[in-house]
Amino acid sequence: MNTKRRQFLATTGGGILGAGLLDSWSASVLGKTNERDGFLLSDEGCGRATGYAEANKIVTFGEQTHVAWLDSPADGFRVWVRTLNRATGLWSPAYMVGEGYDNHGGPALTVDSEGYLHIAYFPHHHAFRYRRSKRPNDASEWEEESSFGEKLTYPTLVCGPDNTLYFTARRSFKEKPWEVELWSKRPGQDWSRVGPILRSRYKGYAHFQESLAWGPDHKTLHLCCRFHENSDKEAYGRLQTVGYMKSEDFGKTWCRSDGGRIETPASVDEIDVLAQGGVDREIGLRAGCLAVDPKTGMPHLIYSIKENGRGRVIMAVSDGKGGWTRSDLSPQLPADLRGRDLIMPGGLSFSDSGQLHGAAQIQKAKEGESTWGNPSNESLRFVRDKDGDMWKISFASEPNSDRSQWLPNIERATGFNQIPDRPAIIYTSGGPGEKNTDLLSNRVYWAG
């Protein structure tokens, strides 16, 4: 379906706005959804339509919730946004923001104190593209596109108390170790490179999976990461490390959880280390997005460990003095799901009322099958009880053994967006494809 026809169908109530007719589990009819229903946002999603959980893709401001993802129609990769009016339950048409280079070009979305939306997207080892909405709390039109940086991939985006934007992305190089760069943008000014804050210890491919979250003071930036480094022809990621650091001055300087100063760009030798793995240790690690308790200011990290053929998810909570309390979520799976692998991607999110929520994947691949995009994948949501002892875990996706329902992205705080008592999750339904440039027709779902 071409872009113009897709916009027409969305506007007239056919196509993606009539999604409930395609999936009996969704109560969405002609673009209307109840808050807890599933809703088909698109049927042209790419292989990573909601991928890279560190990039926030859902923001609520007032009665509007805005959702961004990456499609792959016949004319190439495209970033789209739709808006849910929470008062009426009605969805807007899909509005195109811009292009993506390939399936890595998905967006990161935030909102400032005045309600203007900000979005970064496009690259896979290129400059990022950026736009601001023309009007507050309105995704239907965007200001002229601008670009910044070079050889960047994987965005994170948050908004500071004075509406300065803070952004990180991976920076690749030919002849030296890859890094994570921090950028900022003051209102009305161009993007400015602050500098590298993380660096691999090895030349060549690296991935950092970093996520950002504000402390309650809206000044302290907390960062969780998963270093993936030292790859060669024989092994993809010989060393993996889940780590943490924070900045108490808007990213100017960084320290460990105990306050010990870190010289940046930091390697895993300088930051808090929570878990170690990689091919050489026969342990696979993935990090989800972190969240910070709005009452205590303590960071909550989440990551998965794949070891001896089993996957489990760990939450780690800082005591602010260098210590971490870890808890395994896997034993709290419902009885009929135990025996499956609980894994990231996913993440954590505190609602404005202070309750902790999360998203994860569950899977059980058959022997010899690849776990990446495996049809056994389902997306889960979980919420911690008010006593802080138990988790209620349920499906975010409607179980479907024929389709991978994966890459969940949970709504979370980025500065000025409100987090409802039940944060939304979006996920991709369909396979990854064989190449980064494959144009697929995956479904993209909202789970409210």
Residue map of PLM features:
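N-terminal secretory signal peptides
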Residues: M1-K4
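Extracellular, repeat-based ectodomains that mediate carbohydrate processing or recognition
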Residues: T33-G448
